[in-house]
């Protein structure tokens, strides 16, 4: 395994491998009935999200080929409560996929550092992992907060009508 990882690690393998590991890891978490523990976390607030450039990165994702990877995360049509709740659930699943992928991949990077890969490789792989996994976690959390605001506004309007 050591030889395979140290000789075959490249950025494309990193990104798509971590996505795959994230999907499997999240599936295992769902099967273990511990998924509820991962549903409503906010690791950073809106101000830091903006300062880190996560929203600009989100624009880049939406306007590049990467935006094609998860069509379930696009809201189309008229705004209604059920669609927003489903979109939030899909975003939570995607967020957890990226979080699990980030943790597993960063663990592999640290393991490879102990195995003797160059420091520039550790730094490069870590930056790639942060951008393509952790930033996507932050982006999903930001979007979920926006959905929560819309849902609470709709609920308040419904209470006023009643």
Question: Where does each model-flagged region fall?
Answer:
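Hydrophobic transmembrane alpha-helices
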Residues: 100-145
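Loop-to-transmembrane boundary segments
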Residues: 79-101
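Cytosolic/matrix-facing juxtamembrane and C-terminal tails of multi-pass cellular membrane proteins
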Residues: 138-162
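Membrane-proximal soluble regions of multi-pass membrane proteins
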Residues: 28-87, 153-162
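Alpha-helical transmembrane segments of integral membrane proteins
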Residues: 2, 6-14, 85, 89, ...
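Long, highly hydrophobic alpha-helical transmembrane signal-anchor segments
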Residues: 1-42, 97-115
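Generic structural hydrophobic/aromatic packing signal, biased to beta-strands
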Residues: 20-21, 87, 143
